[in-house]
């Protein structure tokens, strides 16, 4: 079975609830269409879980992009934009990690696509957090 969710925004309890409902098996695939972080406190924990989940596929959402923008260029403008959207809680949890783990999470995020194409039976799907690439 293929499952698609998005916009967890740091809600680890919500993710656990979804996992209980779907009973994700090794042969299933779970797509998460971005925005796993910010607003609620467990975005980094969700990222760590995704990094260890062999049958999970994560796409970038605008919140992950805001984080990467800030990490690339920690300007006041990028900080303000990210924090205005709930990023302060994520940055605090991220900075509490050892440097090696921060690098691993950053590399994981940089390797995530913005969209994915999926074929199930005779149907084609374009998975994306917001608007498709042009």
Where are these regions (language model features)?
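N-terminal active-site segment of His-dependent metallophosphoesterases
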Residues: 1-47
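Generic structural signal for short, solvent-exposed loop/turn connectors between secondary structure elements
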Residues: 1-2, 23-29, 51-57, 97, ...
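Residue-level marker for buried hydrophobic side chains located in beta-strands
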Residues: 4, 32, 58-59, 126
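Short, solvent-exposed loop/turn segments at secondary-structure junctions
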Residues: 9-10, 38, 64-65, 131-134
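Conserved hydrophobic/aromatic beta-strand scaffold that supports enzyme active sites
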Residues: 26, 115-117, 127
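Active-site neighborhood of divalent metal-dependent phosphoester bond hydrolases
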Residues: 40-118, 122-123
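Short, well-ordered beta-to-alpha junction loops that form the rim of enzyme active sites
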Residues: 121-123, 128-132
